[in-house]
Amino acid sequence: MTIAVPSFNQGRFLDDALTSIFQQEIPVEVFVMDGGSSDNSVDVIRKWGHRLCGWRSHADEGQAAAINEAISQGLAPYVCWLNSDDWFLPSGLRKLLDELTIYPDAPAVYGRSWNVVQYSGKRTPVWVEPFHERRLALRCIISQPATLIRRSAWEAVGGVDGALHMAMDYDLWWRLYRQCGPLKFLDDFVAVNREHEATKTKTLRRRHYQEAMSVVRKHHGSVPLKWWLAQPYAVWFKSRFG
């Protein structure tokens, strides 16, 4: 499978991400797209250079563009991306791949993931649910690092939308569903989402809600009341308690 690893100034986490990829029990082609980091990221990338199918480090047009660039360079029939501050659990990719093999009509599969707070180590399960349009309209029920997509479906929808910066994954799930059919849910933990002080959904919470609501409106036709009620509370809670 083809794995894109977009990264920018995440050298302290990047080694964990790459280690988790190469510990998987399946053949992978990995492309690291670094946005011109000023930390130790390039040193980490060079450490893994002999295992990578490609990498670069220079200013780019953002995360979505980097993901599309990486996946376009690969040839494998399955694709995914792993943000450099997240990681896969042992055998996680194998479980996802097996599920797509069993269900050949599914454009993508997603499993469960943990959310780990960096400073405290607190671990909680990410809210994930079996796929249904109504559930997807109420919230993003899919955890991005716990997903695997058929390349044919990825190419059919044109990859991630480069105009989006906060909800590009949420938008992708909608487009895969609309154009290729329901995504398959795997009831097993396969990945970990790391929450830290620089996480975009933490530092840009209001913008994240606004972008996600625009995605719902675009693909579902209306924004459920739950979004309007949850937005101010979530912004306040994050600003107050972190």
Predicted regions and their residues:
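Short beta-strand/loop segment that forms part of the nucleotide-sugar
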Residues: 27-36, 56-59
